[in-house]
Each structure stands twice: as C-alpha cells, then as structure tokens.
Amino acid sequence: MKRQSVRIKLFPLKKEEIPAYLDDKGVFVNDYFKTYLDHSAYQVVEEQQECLVEIVSLADMGFDREATAPQIEERAVEMGYQLPPAPLGVYLRLALLEQEVSQDAILSQGKSPDGAICLLSPQLEKEFTFPRSVYLRKVDQDLWLRAARFDDEYAFPLTTLFAFVTKNANEFVVGSEP
C-alpha cells in the first residue's frame, strides 16, 4: 500500500453504542478491543468533526529497519504528525472498508500482521496485560478492528503501516483537499 491520506468524519457515539454500530457495519472486534473500549481513559467523540489521517509505512517515515513503538512515536512527532486519539480507530475502520486482504489469515499470532494498519494512540494503561493500541485488518473478506498488547521492546517490521493525524478538526479547512 502506498502512502495514503484519508479524510475521516468523526461523530458522537457512546461507548455502549460502538460494538453494535460496528457489528451493523460488518466489522468484527476481538476481546482485547472490548477491554480497550471499556477503559475509563477511553474518551468518546463528543461532537461531529473531521480530521486528516496519513497512512505511512516505517520506510515512508525514513526507517531502514524495524522499529519500536517509542522510536516510531518520536519520529512521527518529528515529522509533524499527531498520535491518533484512542477512538479514531473506530472511525478509520468505518472509512476504510476497501482495505487490502491480509495474506496471512491466522489471527492472534503475537506479531504485527501483514496488511494491518496500526494506530499508536497514547497508552490508556501502562501495564503490558492491557491492550496498548488498535489496528485495522481484513482477513478473507472480514473487516476487523482489533486491539493488541506489546511492550516497548517489540520491533515492528519495516513494512508495517501506521495511521497518524495530520490535521485535527480545528485546523481542517472545509473544501480543501487532503
């Protein structure tokens, strides 16, 4: 997948509405996502807004080998990106219904899956036992929004895709093109 910019529309959804809304759209979630969603620090979108998201690989970010989450987060900030807020994964999943199908159909294998788009949001909880971030994946024809656990030592492969915010709602100019 090439570097891609996506305009995302965010709208109010209560925490308890999110699972049913995703289900209605044909999106599957894992148990880690349910745990992630239930955390008290997970903030829902309160008002309708838009943001621009850029999807980039580690290579697009200038890495020449695998990198850890702290290295990726630091580079993202240096490049002018913002870490995506926790709820952005829901809206990005709804916007990217045409994601490439993963070549590896095995779920939960303890590594970053091919074709996944990861969102390194600020951690809701520092404990390794709690999911750290979410990612979007398409397996067979099923769309997934999954949460994952990993520590600061986990190295993401060079081909891993990440989504970062480039403009938030307050900076967005109506009618401009991404």
What are these regions (language model features)?
Residues 1-178:
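A binding-site-centric feature that preferentially detects glycan-recognition modules on secreted/surface proteins
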